[in-house]
């Protein structure tokens, strides 16, 4: 990301909360600023949104603003909403179409793997999420997008989270939406994908 560029954040409620002062999107914008890069954010996270809804609104919400970059965070609701969710085959089509649209509009795309649904990897929903995230890793390779593997980062961060944090709420407030520690984890993951060094990543802390 270069000085003066625009970054669109497309996502669900996790991204909507990411626009708050302690949210991952704002932490990233502030981290860029600390490195002398002033980026203009477009925050477009909407609670409950799935890949089909994001595909319908990506032009209006993000691409009409001609962003240089777009982060794409989608998958939790596709899985979490069960029968009202989006099956894997449709998810693949929707996410591929979103990336194609963004790249055709001249935006570089950074894909975020979906963070965990409750902080227990053995849970049914997290197991169901695995093929969705595996697809995102493949999509990033195929389309030459950057990838922030936040699901892997979250699993690692939970292993080292202090024992005095409440069980099930070490990185989240409710098992899904990030607490300040989770937002730092996400911001660092995205910044790492953008090429931040370990020293630069260490400066991203809770606000």
Residue locations for each model-derived region?
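Short N-terminal segments immediately surrounding and downstream of signal-peptide cleavage
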Residues: 1-5, 203
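Alpha-helical cap/lid subdomain in secreted, periplasmic
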Residues: 26-40, 52-206
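Catalytic cysteine-centered active-site loop
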Residues: 41-48
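Catalytic nucleophile-elbow at a beta strand-turn-alpha helix junction centered on a G-D-S/GDSL motif
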Residues: 5-20, 49-50, 79
């Amino acid at each position: 990301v270069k000085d003066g560029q625009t970054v669109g954040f497309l996502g669900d409620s996790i991204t909507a909360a990411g626009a708050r002062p302690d949210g991952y999107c704002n932490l990233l914008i502030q981290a860029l600023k600390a490195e002398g890069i002033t980026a203009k954010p477009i925050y477009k996270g909407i609670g409950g949104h799935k890949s089909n809804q994001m595909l319908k609104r990506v032009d209006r919400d993000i691409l009409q603003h001609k962003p240089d970059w777009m982060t794409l965070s989608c998958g939790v609701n596709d899985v979490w909403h069960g029968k009202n969710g989006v099956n894997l085959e449709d998810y693949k089509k929707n996410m591929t179409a979103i990336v194609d649209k963004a790249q055709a509009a001249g935006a570089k795309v950074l894909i975020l793997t979906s963070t965990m649904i409750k902080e227990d990897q053995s849970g049914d929903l997290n197991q169901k999420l695995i093929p969705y995230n595996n697809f995102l890793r493949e999509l990033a390779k195929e389309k030459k997008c950057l990838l922030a593997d936040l699901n892997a980062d979250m699993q690692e961060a939970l292993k080292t989270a202090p024992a005095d944090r409440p069980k099930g709420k070490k990185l989240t407030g409710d098992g899904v939406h990030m607490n300040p520690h989770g937002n730092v984890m996400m911001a660092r993951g995205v910044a790492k994908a953008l090429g931040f060094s370990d020293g630069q990543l260490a400066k991203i802390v809770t606000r």
